[in-house]
Each structure stands twice: as C-alpha cells, then as structure tokens.
A protein has these predicted regions:
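Acidic/aromatic-lined carbohydrate-recognition and catalytic surfaces
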Residues: 1-189
Length: 189
C-alpha cells in the first residue's frame, strides 16, 4: 500500500504490487514479502493494521484498480469522468503524507459501485458465476455479513437478535431483499 504509482488511488494497489514484483524479479529477487491483504471492516474507519482482518478468507477490495476492470471501459462518459474525479480526490501532492485509507476507500467504493452496475459480457458473467460456485457458501455468508455490517454496524452483537443466526429466516429474507448489494460484495472478491 505504500508503493504507489501515478495511477494509484492514494495508496498502492495490486497493480502497483505486480509492477514491483516484475521490477524486483528483474533485479534478481526470488520473492517479495508483503503484509496481509485480508478483508477489512466495511464500515467505519478502516483499520490500518493488516493483522486485524474481518476475514482471512477474503481480500480487501481497497487494493483493486477500478480502471482495470473490464466493465470500466463500458461506462458512459459521465460515469467514467466521475470515476476519474473520485480518483483525484484521493491524491496528495506530498509523497511523505500519511496514507488515508478511509478517503481512498470512500472514493474507490463509489467508483466500484458505478462499475458494478455495468452489464458483464457473457464470458465475464460465466467466470463470475463459476467463481461464486467455487467459493460457495462462505463467499455468500461473507457478502451477507458485509451487507449486514453496512446496515447495522460491524459488531454482530449489536444487530437485531433475529440476524444473529446466519442461516435463520430473517437473514434469508435480508439476502432476498438486498440481493444486488450482496452480489456487489461477492463481485469485489
């Protein structure tokens, strides 16, 4: 996250990491050690420590580069310019400035929501469906937790009692009522 490029959104992302890996390999490096990229809380302030994840099974979507998602190129002109405008809100002229994960995630999540609304090509839809099947119930449960965290806060103890059972009728109802938002959280993975 500290290694940034001119295309970054305020902190380094997976594309910056790939570039660093390529450069490191060209310099003779056999491996590159990174901090964990685990999923963080979806609400409130983003925890700066990668050692306090909300899940070790899923990744933090803050490391996605929105412009490299295939559907980004199908945005209309207005939404594409909005995504670029959101990116500029994350930039800091001072390379020594502290990373602002909250500012980056606020902007990036809005951009990702715009991109998620674009219809996928048939092959991308098939790949996403295959991914969902492969990741199974854990992915759906994690995405449901993300949604419930957005609605009720990240501590499930504070949720209405009927939402404490992830396989109960109330959670099943929420999954149906908010299927699009749950799909978004699965898509982020």
């Amino acid at each position: 996250y500290l290694v940034r490029s001119h295309h970054s959104w305020g902190l380094g992302d997976l594309t910056d990491l790939a570039d660093l890996c390529t450069w490191s390999a060209s310099q003779g490096a056999g491996y590159l050690l990174t901090n964990p990229l685990h999923a963080a809380e979806v609400t409130g302030r983003m925890e700066p420590s990668p050692y306090l994840p909300s899940s070790r099974l899923f990744v933090n979507p803050i490391y996605i580069r929105p412009e490299l998602i295939a559907e980004y190129h199908d945005l209309d002109q207005y939404d594409a310019s909005l995504v670029e405008s959101l990116r500029t809100t994350t930039l800091d002229d001072d390379p020594q400035a502290l990373l602002d994960r909250d500012r980056t995630w606020q902007a990036k999540s809005q951009a990702l929501e715009l991109i998620h609304r674009v219809d996928m090509s048939a092959s991308r839809r098939m790949a996403f469906t295959a991914f969902r099947v492969a990741r199974g119930r854990r992915l759906e449960d994690f995405a449901t937790w993300c949604l419930l965290s957005e609605l009720h806060g990240s501590d499930w103890h504070d949720w209405p009692a009927e939402l404490h059972d992830p396989h109960g009728a109330a959670v099943a109802r929420v999954r149906c009522e908010h299927a699009d938002r749950i799909d978004f959280h699965m898509w982020l993975q």
